[in-house]
Amino acid sequence: MTIIPKRSYNVLTTCKAVFRDVGDYWLTTGNLRTTKPQSPAQGFHRDTLLYPVLQYQPATSPSLIVTLLVSMTDATVANGATRVILSSQNGRLLNTIGGPGRASRAKRWGHAGNPSAAAARWWEAYESGTEYKTNATNFLHKMLASCS
């Protein structure tokens, strides 16, 4: 995981670092997600279904997509903090995602504007991993951006 100091965080800096060995990249999407109070929980899921080409890439392929998640407000358990199951892209957790022990494998992210919650190779952690949002009791705003 790449940790970038809070004051110097920049989406393009992160993408440049991840794609330095494979060449150019494009900022392909960006959106702001708002989780409203008492929103229903979103269960663990894998975002790779959104990118079918990833299913045909060998494990040795360079990262094709990097998704960055930045909380615009503090992400807490009460307002729906995202959890990531690291290494879940390897498929070992596929049949146990909802099973016992999942909380011990899940890492919660972050504080408002905290780049350490976003400046990682999300191909391995978030995009091919899983996320979960608990019932929100107040607003949570997240910025998502993808480079490919």
From Swiss-Prot:
One of its GO terms (molecular function) is dioxygenase activity. Its EC number is 1.14.-.-. Pfam families: PhyH (PF05721). Keywords: Dioxygenase, Iron, Metal-binding, Oxidoreductase. Its cofactor is Fe cation. The keyword Oxidoreductase applies. Fe cation binds at H45, D47. SUPFAM superfamilies: Clavaminate synthase-like. It comes from the Eukaryota. One of its GO terms (biological process) is terpenoid biosynthetic process. Pathway: Secondary metabolite biosynthesis; terpenoid biosynthesis. Homodimer. Belongs to the PhyH family. Iron/alpha-ketoglutarate-dependent dioxygenase; part of the gene cluster B that mediates the biosynthesis of austinol and dehydroaustinol, two fungal meroterpenoids. The first step of the pathway is the synthesis of 3,5-dimethylorsellinic acid by the polyketide synthase ausA. 3,5-dimethylorsellinic acid is then prenylated by the polyprenyl transferase ausN. Further epoxidation by the FAD-dependent monooxygenase ausM and cyclization by the probable terpene cyclase ausL lead to the formation of protoaustinoid A. In A.calidoustus, the austinoid gene cluster lies on a contiguous DNA region, while clusters from E.nidulans and P.brasilianum are split in their respective genomes. Genetic rearrangements provoked variability among the clusters and E.nidulans produces the least number of austionoid derivatives with the end products austinol and dehydroaustinol, while P.brasilianum can produce until acetoxydehydroaustin, and A.calidoustus produces the highest number of identified derivatives. This is Iron/alpha-ketoglutarate-dependent dioxygenase ausU.
